[in-house]
Amino acid sequence: MRPIQSPPGVSVPVKSRPRRRPDLTLPLPQRDVSLAVPLPLPPTSGGSGGSSGSAPSSGGSASSTNTNSSIEAKNYSDLVRGNRIGSGAGGTVYKVIHRPSSRLYALKVIYGNHEETVRRQICREIEILRDVNHPNVVKCHEMFDQNGEIQVLLEFMDKGSLEGAHVWKEQQLADLSRQILSGLAYLHSRHIVHRDIKPSNLLINSAKNVKIADFGVSRILAQTMDPCNSSVGTIAYMSPERINTDLNQGKYDGYAGDIWSLGVSILEFYLGRFPFPVSRQGDWASLMCAICMSQPPEAPATASPEFRHFISCCLQREPGKRRSAMQLLQHPFILRASPSQNRSPQNLHQLLPPPRPLSSSSSPTT
């Protein structure tokens, strides 16, 4: 059967999808030069309106991390795969050794035989994340394509995740929160929304440096600020407007969504349990009702006014009322975490209890 053709000289209008909606344009977090932690501006290649200079490099452990990033894709054979240290919906993570340098890394093997368009998007996001360089963000060193399987070489965090950690001392919790906020503010300044902030995606090493990890569901935002409406991430830590799209007129601010997830995680550290009146492993209906219908959880009355206010700034039902990561870095609760006090060896040893390992599996693989 031949397709129906329009008569000569008659043009048929073709409907085109609108490229952007002005009402969905969201403000970017503004750079605050008074921050104790310098945050580089978004790269100029992302569009107009950025700084003409290049982003300043971060100091501290980030500079030392750069010395490990000289592994080329052609040297994949130099990696010796060891134990599996974690697994999730996006893939499996293995501990590997780079034989020429004897350095340890984490190798994430991404699941699935993806279509070409999906593979290009994954590779594009990984390439952008390779340029991320901050002391509180897990470094992405290299990407490999092995027989159609995408594998990502990451910084190795030897103490695992903070899932199950109970940090009831506010001074220590303030230092923990400051590190996470520092990394989150840096990511947001580069138009990167994580979308899955939770304790199991916050890693710690033997130096007690806390870093944000697992960008398997992160999204790079263009200058047009396309809305992030896809349901990725862990529902227990999702913001109300992300679960129920009828809230907030259907608009989703990815930055504010990360702040909600951060607030739930920090309150969970303080309480030693999931802060909502349901189990985070419960059924979806119970979780959604608790998050969308009930009042946001609060810090207990026994906590300090500063901490109670900090949690309130994160867990506002209306996204526009939540503070940005850069604003929260100036909150009185965070400012009490003086690096000169919290970075002494004695306090570092007591900062957190030994976290649970990423995985109970210890069988070596090849």
From Swiss-Prot:
Residues 53-69 have a biased composition (Low complexity). It catalyses: L-seryl-[protein] + ATP = O-phospho-L-seryl-[protein] + ADP + H(+); L-threonyl-[protein] + ATP = O-phospho-L-threonyl-[protein] + ADP + H(+); L-tyrosyl-[protein] + ATP = O-phospho-L-tyrosyl-[protein] + ADP + H(+). It comes from the Eukaryota. SUPFAM superfamilies: Protein kinase-like (PK-like) (SSF56112). The keyword Plastid applies. It is an enzyme of class 2 (transferase). It holds the Pfam family Pkinase. Keywords: ATP-binding, Chloroplast, Cytoplasm, Hypersensitive response, Kinase, Nucleotide-binding, Nucleus, Phosphoprotein, Plant defense, Plastid, Serine/threonine-protein kinase, Transferase. Phosphorylation at Thr-224 and Ser-230 by MAP kinase kinase kinases positively regulates kinase activity. Phosphorylation at Ser-230 and Thr-234 by GSK3/Shaggy-like kinase ASKs negatively regulates kinase activity. Phosphorylated by MAPKKK5. It is found in: Cytoplasm; Nucleus; Plastid, Chloroplast stroma. The active site is at D196. Expressed higher in stems and leaves than in flowers and roots. Changing T224D: Constitutively active. Changing T234A: Abolishes phosphorylation by ASK7/BIN2. Residues 1-69, 339-366 are annotated as: Disordered. Its main location: cytoplasm. Interacts with ASK7/BIN2. Interacts with P.syringae type III effector HopF2. Interacts with MPK6. Interacts with RACK1A, RACK1B and RACK1C. Interacts with MAPKKK5 mainly in the cytosol. Belongs to the protein kinase superfamily. STE Ser/Thr protein kinase family. MAP kinase kinase subfamily. Involved in the second phase of hydrogen peroxide generation during hypersensitive response-like cell death. Involved in the innate immune MAP kinase signaling cascade (MEKK1, MKK4/MKK5 and MPK3/MPK6) downstream of bacterial flagellin receptor FLS2. Activates by phosphorylation the downstream MPK3 and MPK6. YDA-MKK4/MKK5-MPK3/MPK6 module regulates stomatal cell fate before the guard mother cell (GMC) is specified. This MAPK cascade also functions downstream of the ER receptor in regulating coordinated local cell proliferation, which shapes the morphology of plant organs. This is Mitogen-activated protein kinase kinase 4.
